[in-house]
Regions:
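Mg2+-dependent phosphoryl-transfer enzymes with acidic/Ser/Thr/Gly-rich catalytic loops
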Residues: 23-32, 49, 215-296
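Short, structured coil segments at secondary-structure junctions
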Residues: 84, 89, 97, 200-202, ...
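Hydrophobic packing residues within well-ordered alpha-helices of enzyme cores
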Residues: 52, 77-81, 192, 196, ...
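Active-site phosphate-binding/coordination module
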Residues: 50-151
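Short active-site oxyanion
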Residues: 63-67, 89-91, 179, 239-241, ...
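Residue-level signal for inorganic ion chemistry
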Residues: 39, 59, 70, 97, ...
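Conserved acidic, metal-coordinating active-site core of Asp-based
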Residues: 126-244, 248
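Non-catalytic pre-domain segments flanking phosphatase-related domains
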Residues: 1-37, 54-57, 61
Length: 296
């Protein structure tokens, strides 16, 4: 579903936001701010520090559009979107590493790409056979047959989403899911990545986002491709964007952006590829770079 299909009141709301942003942002060297969350926007406690929050609110007041771009599910991003008042200022949520875009000003889905239906039972049977936990998302809940798995609990903690135990995961997933997550000990996830990539790699992407997390997502989705869709919607170009990240899944958007900023705590390859390296996520690195490059 695309944003052009909004009901008229929502179209009017978005148009009003766009006009206000256009009036305010003329002096900004970068008019869209794309932010990874974990290890970038948030500190080790998974919270936004007061300094970083203050600078991002000020940037939005001056017309900047904030995009929260994460591998998290939509409802795992919502608390941070609300904290930064993206609903008031017309920001966007980019969830599942780009698999879904939500206009948080109107709370309407702009874009979604789904897992191929034929792959889902294959993944499910593989997890059952190997004894790995497999989870999906239903509204604001994590659904799984293994709620006591420590890595399932970690996904719950990161996203601040409750876990619901189900007897058959396939019966409780959202229609047309965008992502499944398999969890297990790091050595077993290496094997699972290799085996599932060989079996399903022509249909979908399989990769580890952490040693114990195996992501199963639509093929060809990344943050840069979804940001290009979003930039076209708001009539901006990559040159208008400053992007922040720390992980390998952030590289595509750092390369796309007019200014790609890596955190000091980023992986060495990410720092080497960035246009600029700021302070760490424990030192208000996002705020420091925005003050430098946006003159706010």
């Amino acid at each position: 579903m695309y944003c052009l299909r909004f009901a008229l009141p929502l179209q009017a709301k978005r148009q009003d936001m766009d006009k206000q942003q256009n009036r305010n942002q003329a002096h900004l060297p970068y008019r869209i701010i794309a932010l990874d969350l974990d290890g970038t926007l948030t500190n080790h406690d998974k919270v936004i520090t007061p300094k970083t929050r203050e600078v991002l609110l000020k940037a939005q007041q001056e017309g900047a559009i904030v995009v929260l771009a994460s591998g998290r599910p939509t409802y795992g991003i919502v608390p941070l979107a609300n904290e930064l008042k993206l609903d008031t200022h017309g920001g966007f949520i980019l969830a599942y590493n780009g698999g879904k875009i939500v206009d948080w000003g109107t709370q309407q889905e702009c874009f979604a790409q789904h897992l191929p239906p034929s792959a889902i039972p294959v993944i499910y049977e593989y997890a059952k056979r190997k004894g790995h936990a497999l989870l999906g998302y239903a509204g604001n809940e994590i659904v799984t047959e293994m709620p006591d798995d420590p890595y399932v609990k970690e996904e719950s903690r990161i996203n601040k989403m409750n876990i619901r135990r189900v007897d058959n995961l396939l019966m409780h997933l959202e229609p047309n899911p965008t992502k499944l997550l398999m969890t297990g000990e790091p050595t077993t996830m290496i094997v699972a990545e290799e085996e599932l990539a060989e079996q399903l790699g022509d249909k979908m992407d399989v990769f580890r986002s952490a040693p114990f997390f195996l992501e199963l997502v639509p093929k060809g989705i990344d943050k840069a491709q979804s940001l290009l869709r979003l930039l076209a919607k708001v009539n901006l170009t990559p040159a208008d964007m400053i992007a922040f990240g720390d992980g390998y899944n952030d590289l595509s958007m750092l390369r796309l952006a007019g200014m790609g900023v890596a955190m000091a705590n980023a992986a060495p390859e990410v720092r080497a590829d960035a246009d600029y390296v700021t302070l760490s996520n424990e030192e208000d690195g996002v705020a420091a770079a925005l003050e430098k490059f946006l003159n706010i």
